[in-house]
């Protein structure tokens, strides 16, 4: 299955074969290009650098947060009468996005350390710190919430009689 299967499961892509690989490559490339643009912008001197670094944690958090909300909506819709597989797919999407949000916040924190070294100042001080803290809190909160709800659901599932 390999790397493409893992990345595909993160993106929740239903395509198969060559189309799946092309879509995964495209999404990953776009993400790397966007991240690269922000890092390069951050290394430029003056006001541009401060703007880039002030916005970086918020931009990093947009994709995983949107992804989490999509998974949350899908999971809520599956709560009624959908299959176990559908519930698990939605759950997986939310867990991946929660971890993604936490990782992005960590990357933004590393970016702020680089900004301190390069510019001898914290760029966008309050804005940047707020963005990083919000992402770390949201990511960790999502992971804790998801684990707690999952355990409750499994316990409820064990109480039901098995189908023959």
Regions found by a protein language model. Give the residues of each.
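Canonical alpha-helical transmembrane segments of integral membrane proteins
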Residues: 25-44, 60-63, 100-112
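Cytosolic juxtamembrane N-terminal segments of multi-pass membrane proteins
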Residues: 1-21, 82-87
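Membrane-water interface of transmembrane alpha-helices
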Residues: 62-82, 143-150
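Helix-coil boundary and interhelical linker segments in multi-pass alpha-helical membrane proteins
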Residues: 41-52, 117-124
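Cytosolic juxtamembrane helix at the C-terminal end of the final transmembrane segment
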Residues: 139-163
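Short membrane-interface loop/juxtamembrane segments of multi-pass integral membrane proteins
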Residues: 81-98
């Amino acid at each position: 299955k390999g790397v493409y299967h893992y990345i595909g499961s993160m993106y929740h892509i239903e395509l198969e074969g060559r189309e799946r690989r092309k879509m995964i490559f495209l999404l990953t490339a776009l993400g790397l290009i966007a991240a690269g643009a922000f890092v390069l912008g951050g290394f430029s001197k003056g006001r541009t650098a401060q703007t880039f670094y002030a916005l970086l944690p918020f931009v990093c958090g947009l994709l995983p947060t949107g992804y989490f909300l999509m998974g949350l909506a899908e999971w809520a819709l599956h709560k009624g009468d959908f299959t176990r597989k559908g519930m698990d797919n939605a759950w997986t999407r939310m867990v991946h996005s929660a971890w993604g949000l936490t990782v992005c916040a960590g990357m933004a924190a590393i970016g702020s350390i680089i900004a301190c070294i390069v510019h001898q100042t914290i760029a966008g001080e309050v804005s940047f710190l707020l963005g990083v803290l919000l992402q770390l809190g949201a990511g960790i909160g999502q992971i804790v919430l998801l684990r707690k709800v999952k355990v409750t659901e499994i316990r409820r599932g064990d109480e039901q009689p098995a189908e023959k």
